């Protein structure tokens, strides 16, 4: 109603706070599919500062305004994920630990690819992109099958040799059972730092620590991540990277009416 049909404008997407930018590649594809010229002023995975232009747009004013919110939502969410991931990754590195920081499958419906790509751009590990990327034996599988040992046995018999097997455990005894059964990765789910130490120590005493990767997950955040990294686990997976993300503050501003 307000904007004449053939008005053309130049606009810019501007960062309102510092962070790691993600979603530029997807934004360009979206804009170009709508006939809007898009010029990236920063690459995915790079840091931006407050007030910096990250993307320039040129084209039909109605189209740009119609896609504005979708565009900002996508880049803001992905950049927020990348920024938080990078902050945690760098915190662990700065403390001298080599623990991998990974996300989980607790992503927004329909946005798993974008969420996980943002984690990767922030320096984190994507864990599984799809259910069939790896065999993850969880508590409900064990409840149905009867035991971790039997679940691992079935997985090893039926799966390709190329598939790693991870077992989610809820006690030190289950961790030992899973490792002895031949699981490649042991996930200590909702363990306290004290319980993680006990599990790692027990695996060492049994002579099987070097045969498995140890992942911890559940109730871990930016504040307590170093408590877990200091124990010597291999992977820390955090649901907060994607399910509780704070979007990076961005805005779209029309800079010039060209026609």
Language-model features, listed with the residues they occupy:
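Acidic/glycine-rich phosphate/pyrophosphate-binding loops and surrounding catalytic core
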Residues: 1-181, 185, 197-202, 213-215, ...
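Short, basic/aromatic-enriched C-terminal tail that caps enzymatic domains
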Residues: 244-258
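Short acidic, glycine/proline-enriched helix-loop-strand junctions
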Residues: 205-212, 255-259
